[in-house]
Each structure stands twice: as structure tokens, then as C-alpha cells.
């Protein structure tokens, strides 16, 4: 009887658990084919974490086009079955819901059911999508619920393809084994905000969170129109946050006596403070305080207090250089003393040019220089260089490469391919005995390569401000074979490859010399201002009454330069007095309007004034900027004057009239909308890439650049290098000079031989 009761209880419990089991197995249901995804049923294991009911939430859609490796789509193959995306979660938020919406197409040759797509989150299996007969060769839409309890600060979604095209004697490298993931696939997330204590020990969180991959948007609030000292303090803080944001990008909207509905930085003194701080006690030292937004406790404000503007500057430098000591809800910045002066070209984000650099110094994460798999993924190393590095007559760049790899089982065509900026450099065989795994290379740069069998010239390699050095280890993997009756199969073993941290690359033998104006150098590297990482050689010229849009342009610009150099602009000088321009040996950054002393139409090729504008266009405009632009091509061909009602902005570069080695970059706009276009261009990497030459015109349609006007040179070259540079663009003149040199040398030798012959034949000569 007890046994019967036990069986009955087990049956009842099993039936009660059956619906939950079916719900939990929802991800494994066949996906929809050419249909919109349906909302999956929620299982008990995917319940949201407990948060306050009043906590604000936000919904995020992360498409594969945004977060997957370029181009956003994934091609999963038999020998390379894994693909994935990565995303972070802010420390002041918690995920309450997550759904992966996949768009994929399986090969029509796959065996149904035996072939499948597995979805992992942080190596936890979230769901399995079997490939059905109806899906073969067709675009398929599927939803996979993600358990939010497994979402952490940093997350990796891995897609693993298990493919079979026959029951026996399969070849994993068969071209019929594939499954393509579309770039429209997306991860839908719902985040709830958490109440955060006012504790600066976590600074810069929540104002900047390294786990957040989105561009940093951090409003800056002033009591009213800021004076020069407040502008400088805000620039220091903005550039420091820009240096932390790095590749994410940054934006600093400016507000006068108005609080945004998000985390923000507030500047206030005892005499000048926003209205919401009117009851705050006066301070007697530079103070940095974290407090709640008066209308929303989930929003935090970082208030930079001071008795006067001098205190604000000290507090700003404390944020930039002493934040590691922050703790509690407020700190007092007693003193900030510079110990060592910055040197030219010592930006932390740039490759050192004073000595050889190890690859270990170039790493940005721990496992960057290693890879594994039947076909190991490429190893990439970023090289951010000063844009004025002179490489025209260089024989190459010295690189001492130390690498390790899994030996090929036989002597075959396995090799290591080295590429720079997607252009092939050299290939080296991977020996089965590993007799040699250290290479002394010289990477050819800007000299051209000749194919050994034809007269076709391979395009010369060019190093820019941002470069990618790629190492591809390509293995010729032996695969099983045989017939159905006599099949040979084995389990493939992944290959492992490592580039040694002690490998070096040397840029220390090159001069600094560049043809200016070059807006590409400014857009991609902040040059010439970034030559000194702390902007100590930069003078920013602001209007006497800057608007919010003009202040935002200043902060966005110094923030972008900070992101490119990795160092804050602690020594930037700002002025609104054009009389000080001539007395300062510095590069000029002009916001708003060009001062009268610089208005010389021989130097400036674009002026934006109200709704009227004029521009000089060059005689010949090429699709890509030349390394050595021809003087005839850049001569002004026509001047057009246009009056229009639409907004326009411009970035203009020209030589300083006060110093031949100094440059002027002017950021101009004709209206508030024009400044919005200008700020969008400064913060958009795609629009920055379209800037080159001396003038970049920004309209609603995009960015159009011109190289027009005089070219000048910044830097130093020895006289013989300068001579070669001058003659490099004039081959006929070079040939004439070479011929004259040969004739002159021949004449000197002839005269010398005549003298020697005369002496030898002279009987009176002893």
C-alpha cells in the first residue's frame, strides 16, 4: 500500500512539474521561419532580481551590427564553429530581463535535428536551437530567453554551431558545414537602476563606468556664463573623463543654471552657484562632493566647490591627478603639485618613440597576444603613433618578433602572415620542428614593393596615427578521409599560438616632420595640440560671452583630445583677449569666431559669418589626400559666395602668423544648429575620418573636406633630408640636378687627372 501511495505521489508531483519543465524548455522549440519573433513564456529560473518597485528602468537593444566584431554578421563553420558578442552592465544597474533575438540561415546540406545551435552566456547553457528540415537554407528567426541572474559586469554570449551533413565519415572542413548569423540579430535587455550611496571611493562611477560600452554623455552645469578660470577647470575635468572614455567617445552638454535628468558635473563657488545650491553652506577650501539630484535620488551630481575660481582649478586638477585618494561623500583637495614636466610626444596612448617598445606594453587586455582553435583567430596589435612621424625615406621599421605555436604534425604549407593596416607584409613558414621561432624583421613602409614575376607595383604601405598590426597563423590541418565502408575519423586537436610579450618594435630612429595644415591629424590624433599631452603648448581662444553651444564645443574638443592622448589637459591656457595671441608661443584653438588679427584671406580659406559664407576651392581635388600635395593642385581656382538659411559649420586649419612652427585650428559655426552639427562631427568617428586638408565644411548632408591654400611644414629635418623631401615631388628637377652633379664630378676628376698627368710628365718635378 505504501508503495502504491509513493507511486501516486510521484505521479502527482511529476504532473505538477510538467508545465514548468515545458516552459523552461521553450528556448529549444523550433524557431520561426520568416516570421516575427514571439514573446517566449517566462520560466521560474528567469525571474528578475528583486529591486525597488519605484526604481526607474530602461530598455536597451544591442544589435550584432553594434557589438559583434565587424562586419556584425557571423559565419560559423565546421572548423570554426564559435562566434560571440560581449557586453557590460553598469555597476548602478541590474538586469531584470534579457532576450536574444537571432536571425540565422543554416546550410541546406545539414542533417536536421542532429545539427543545432547552442547559446551560452558566460559559459552557462541558455538554450539549444535544433535545425529542422523546414529551416534548411532559409532565414530563420528565433528567440532565446536569457537568465538575468547570470548577467554580470562583463558578459560574453557565445554561439556554438554543431553541424552534421552525413552520418559517417564526415569532413569537419567541408564547405557544406555552415550557419550564418545575421547582423540584425539583437540582444534586448531591461535594466533597473539601483540606489547608490554617495561614496567617492568608487569614483569615477557612476559618472563614468568602464563596464558601459556606450559613448559617455556627461552634462556640465555652471551657475551662469563661466569666466576663463571656470572654463579651464571644466576643460581639465572634461579632458580627464575623455581620457577614461577612450574609444567609447564622449560628449559634454553645457547648461547654465539648469540641472539635467542624468548624472552631471556642477561647478560652483561661494559667490556663484546654481539655484539648487543656494542653501548649501559656504566652503573654505577646494571641495569635491557627491550628492543626490534634488528631484531624483537615482541621479548623482558631482559638485566641484571652491571659495573662488582658484579653488575650482585646484579641485579640477585633484580630479584629474588625485582621484585615487577619493573616499566618502566629499573630499578636500589640499594641494596638487606637479613633480615632472611633460615631454613632447609622451602621450600615454601613443607608442613611445624614444626607445624600442615591447608588445607587452601595447597590450590592452591579458589574452590579446594569444589565440587557439583549428584556425586560430588573428592576433591584433594597435599602434597609435604621432601623426608627424617622418617615414618617407625610411628603409623600414625594425621589429624583433618572438612567437610560439603548436607544431604542425607534418611539414606542410602552414605559415604566419603579417599584415599592417590590411596590407600584406611578409609570410613565414611554421616548421614542424620549431627550430626557429624568433624573427628579426624590417617592415617596409612607404617605399613600395615589387612583385617578383610581374611589373605590377604593390601599393606602398602607409602608417597613420592609428594602425593595426595583424598576425595570422594559418594551419594546413589534416582531415579524416576514406570511404563509407572504410572510414578514418579522429578528434581534431586545437592549435595554440602566442606572440611573446618580449617582442619589440622600434620607432626611435625617426624625425618629426609634417606638412600642414592637416585636419586628418587633428581629427584622428588631436595634432598639433596633442604634441604636449597636457596641452601646455595650446592656447584656446573663446568668445567673451560664450554660449552653451560654444562651451560644449570647447569641452567636446578637449575631451576628444584627452581620449586620443590618454592624459588630461591640466596645463591648457584659455583666453578671450585677442591681444594675448601674439605674445604666446602656442598653437591656437579657436572656438566661435576668428579674431581680427588673424583675418587674412591669404591664410584663411573659409569664413563663416552669420548666414553668409565664402569658400575658395582648389584647382584639382583628389578622392584621397596626398602625402605630398602638388602646389598646382592646391592653388585656389574659384571663390564662391553663397547666402543661405541652412545651418553650416567648418573646421579650418592654417599657419599662425606669429610663429612659423605654430598652427591655428578654428571651429566655426553660424547658428545653434550649426554648433550641433559641429559637435556631432567632433564626436562621430566616421565624420572625423572624412576630415583632411585645410578646410572641412559640415552641413546636414555630412562632411566635405578640401586641401586649398598654402602648405607649411612643422618639425625639423636635417638639411639633406629636407633636400630630398623638396625634390621628391619634382622628378625632372631631380634628374637635372643628378645630371649636373655627374657632369661636375666628371669635370673635377678630369681636372685632377690632368694635374697628376702634368706632374708625372714634368721633368723638373721631383
From Swiss-Prot:
Signal peptide boundaries: 1-35
Main location: membrane
A Pfam entry, by short name: BcsB
InterPro entries listed in its UniProt record: Cell_synth_B (IPR003920), Cell_synthase_bac (IPR018513)
The keyword Nucleus is annotated on this UniProt entry: no
Topology of the protein relative to the lipid bilayer: Single-pass type I membrane protein
Keywords: c-di-GMP, Cell inner membrane, Cell membrane, Cellulose biosynthesis, Membrane, Signal, Transmembrane, Transmembrane helix
Compartments, as annotated in UniProt: Cell inner membrane
Family in the record: Belongs to the AcsB/BcsB family.
PANTHER family, per the entry: CYCLIC DI-GMP-BINDING PROTEIN
Protein name (database record): Cyclic di-GMP-binding protein
Natural source organism: Salmonella typhi
Gene: bcsB
